[in-house]
């Protein structure tokens, strides 16, 4: 899962590339990995920058505003849970079907890019050219990596899901956050985020 990936990347930076200190930036899974770099490896990882909140405080929302955000977030996520549940519980079954079907991989990826993008008039080509769409699809087809890309969901579930450990201590390294217009998931109130990160 992403916590193990963070451990591997930290070792690579320190032992293979000989950096004593580094910063990490990530979105989506990269944000989750950056969170774990900041949490587990702050002796080496000196700052992180993320554009989505993928991890949750173990104590959950505390204020009325935070609780309202959580209710809205949970409601919004219902429409996204199908693919995540499949990949977090049965990634290999899905992978066998996809690796045998380029059209299946294309449909899976295009549906996500369509649903997660700020489209004009519901037209995916208002944001992505056919070349960009095909390049994304072909990366998975030509490298046979739909399978391995799916397993990170399973790994995160095995590592405890979206929540930091119950004995969580705030990530004290400087944290930068980018919030773009029309994000798929709305950020929680700043009070919630500041219980997790040292925002700069």
Language-model regions, residue ranges each:
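Beta-sheet entry/capping signal
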Residues: 10-11, 20-24, 31, 44-49, ...
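Alpha/beta-hydrolase active-site loop
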Residues: 1-16
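Active-site-adjacent bridging/hinge elements
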Residues: 7-9, 79-85, 194-200
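Conserved structured core elements
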Residues: 3-7, 23, 27, 31, ...
């Amino acid at each position: 899962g992403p916590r193990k990936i963070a451990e591997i990347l930290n070792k690579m930076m320190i032992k293979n590339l000989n950096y004593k200190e580094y910063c990490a930036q990530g979105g989506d899974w990269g944000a989750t990995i950056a969170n774990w770099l900041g949490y587990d490896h702050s002796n080496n990882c000196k700052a992180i920058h993320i554009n989505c909140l993928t991890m949750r405080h173990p104590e959950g929302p505390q204020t009325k505003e935070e609780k309202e955000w959580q209710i809205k977030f949970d409601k919004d996520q219902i429409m996204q849970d199908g693919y995540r549940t499949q990949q977090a519980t049965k990634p290999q079954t899905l992978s066998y079907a996809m690796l045998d079907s380029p059209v299946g991989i294309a449909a899976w990826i295009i549906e996500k890019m369509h649903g997660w993008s700020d489209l004009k008039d519901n037209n995916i080509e208002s944001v992505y050219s056919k070349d960009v769409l095909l390049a994304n699809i072909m990366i998975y087809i030509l490298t046979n990596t739909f399978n391995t890309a799916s397993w990170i969901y399973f790994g995160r579930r095995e590592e405890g899901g979206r929540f930091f450990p119950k004995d969580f201590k705030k990530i004290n390294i400087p944290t930068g956050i980018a919030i773009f217009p029309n994000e798929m998931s709305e950020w929680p109130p700043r009070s919630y985020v500041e219980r997790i990160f040292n925002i700069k």
